[in-house]
Amino acid sequence: MIDVRNLSIRFGSHLVIDNISFSLDRGSDMVILGHHGAGKTSILNWIFGQVKGSGEMIIDQVKMSNPTSKKLLKSGVCLVPEEGCVFPDLTVRENLLFSQTLINSNNPIPENEGFFKNLYHLLDTKAFSLSGGQTRMLSILMGMMRKPKYLFLDEPFAGLSQDAIDTFMQQLKILKSKN
């Protein structure tokens, strides 16, 4: 379980997040809704130690003080940011292999199945040649390959077709059932 307690985030004199608390059980879904500029991304950035704020976070009964991406990855927490995490000069295959290296995984790249089927024919294509939706799918796949306990997605459907969204949701259900 992830517990966030009494989170407040301020940028200068502007209070963006005012004393919110929430809990997220492993395997559950949570959506943070709000208009542009409401602080949704700021919450994720605080969780991942990228912005300062007050409050506390407990992951699986361990208090996380000064969280870093490395600490969070070791705790099974993964963020796929809105802008993605793809290296444009690498091919799709190289991006996936690099992602595997980061997690010390020897698992083969998933072949023509599920969410990946939309990218499989592009394995040897440089990421800078992908459409916005394809780049987004690659970022999400790189995050899902880590098989995280907790997967945070910032604006997960930006640039995706309805077909890709439906396929992604099916794959997410499969991932949740396996973990």
Features from the language model and the residues they span:
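Conserved structural motif at the start of ABC-family nucleotide-binding domains
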Residues: 2, 17-19
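The feature captures the beta-strand-to-loop junction immediately N-terminal to the Walker
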Residues: 33-35
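Helix-to-loop junction immediately C-terminal to a conserved catalytic motif
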Residues: 48
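ABC ATPase NBD coupling module
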Residues: 63-78, 83-84, 124
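Conserved ABC ATPase signature
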Residues: 126-130
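A short, proline-enriched helix->beta-strand linker immediately N-terminal to the Walker B motif
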Residues: 144-149
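Walker B catalytic motif
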Residues: 155-156
